[in-house]
Amino acid sequence: MKLHLKYLWIVLVACTLTACMNGGGDLAGKWQLRQYQYADGTSEKVDSVFYNFQKGSFSAICLLKDGGVTTFFGNYSLKGAEISIILLPESVNDKNYDTYFGWPEGKRTFKVEDLSYSSLRLEYEGQKSIFRKF
């Protein structure tokens, strides 16, 4: 009987740990963009953009100045210290695209400078985008 309880306990712990895994490592989930840091040393605070990463799917929720919301969709791939984001054509054609993205051809590859359970820092040509887990 004790042996059965021991195995049952091991199975329950394994199931619990598996259920807690998000399948995308530390990157999976919602991130709030907090700041841009530019190569010239200046910075810009941001609080109205949220990136979401989940099993290869990407979305960005952007709060508009008029109180509305717009969402951009795409895909991402994380390979080593680089993340590539490709937005769907419908998102690139959105009237707010240039305000929030403006990436040529709707795609960008960032260097991942920092990725932990609570912070994310992406770099592209000297510009850093700093996020916090939301």
Protein language model features and the residues they cover:
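Sec-dependent bacterial lipoprotein signal peptides
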Residues: M1-C20
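Lipid interaction determinants
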Residues: C20-N75, K79-F134
